[in-house]
Each structure stands twice: as C-alpha cells, then as structure tokens.
Amino acid sequence: MARITVEDCLAEVGNRFLIVQMAIKRVKQYREGYSPLVESKNKEIVTALREIAATKVLPESYHTADGKKPGSE
C-alpha cells in the first residue's frame, strides 16, 4: 500500500494550510456526490490528498509563473 502525506502535496501546492483546506473541501464534495478523480480504495481524506498530489485538484488562486491560470489562453 502506497502512503500519501501532506509532504507529498507540498511540492505541488507549497502551503500546508492550503492543502488541508483543499482536502477538507474535497471530502465535503465527495459527500455531496462528486466522484473521485483518482482511483483509490482508501478513506475520503486520503483520496483527496492523492488528488492534490497528482495535481488533479488545484487551489482556486493557482497561477503559473507567467501569471495565467493553467489551461487559459
């Protein structure tokens, strides 16, 4: 079983407090009926951290180095 930690997510987000907020929000979305974006047989919080580490979920204020949001032209 692969382990996921907040440190795994820090490389993508950079702020541990934001990671926790993102994970909590994602767990609430699961409970509202949203489907997970990664395959996981773990608890909801671990699945949320896996999504963050895989950059399937990004913070709303996320911008690239050029100041644009990913995917915006």
From Swiss-Prot:
Where does the UniProt annotation place the signal sequence?
A: none
* Gene Ontology biological process terms from the UniProt entry: DNA-templated transcription
Q: Which SUPFAM superfamilies match?
A: RPB6/omega subunit-like (SSF63562)
**What's an example GO cellular component term for this entry?**
DNA-directed RNA polymerase complex
User: Under the GO molecular function aspect, what terms does this record hold?
Assistant: DNA binding; DNA-directed RNA polymerase activity
By its UniProt entry, which Gene3D superfamilies does this protein fall under? 3.90.940.10
Keywords assigned by UniProt, alphabetized: DNA-directed RNA polymerase, Nucleotidyltransferase, Transcription, Transferase
Going by the entry's taxonomy, the superkingdom of the source organism is recorded as Bacteria
UniProt EC number: 2.7.7.6
- Give me the reactions it catalyses: RNA(n) + a ribonucleoside 5'-triphosphate = RNA(n+1) + diphosphate
* Pfam families in the record: RNA_pol_Rpb6
Please give the subunit comment from the record.
Answer: The RNAP catalytic core consists of 2 alpha, 1 beta, 1 beta' and 1 omega subunit. When a sigma factor is associated with the core the holoenzyme is formed, which can initiate transcription.
PANTHER family noted in UniProt: DNA-DIRECTED RNA POLYMERASE SUBUNIT OMEGA
Report the family membership. Answer: Belongs to the RNA polymerase subunit omega family.
Q: What is known about what this protein does?
A: Promotes RNA polymerase assembly. Latches the N- and C-terminal regions of the beta' subunit thereby facilitating its interaction with the beta and alpha subunits.
The protein's name in its UniProt record: DNA-directed RNA polymerase subunit omega
User: What organism is listed for this UniProt entry?
Assistant: Maridesulfovibrio salexigens (strain ATCC 14822 / DSM 2638 / NCIMB 8403 / VKM B-1763)
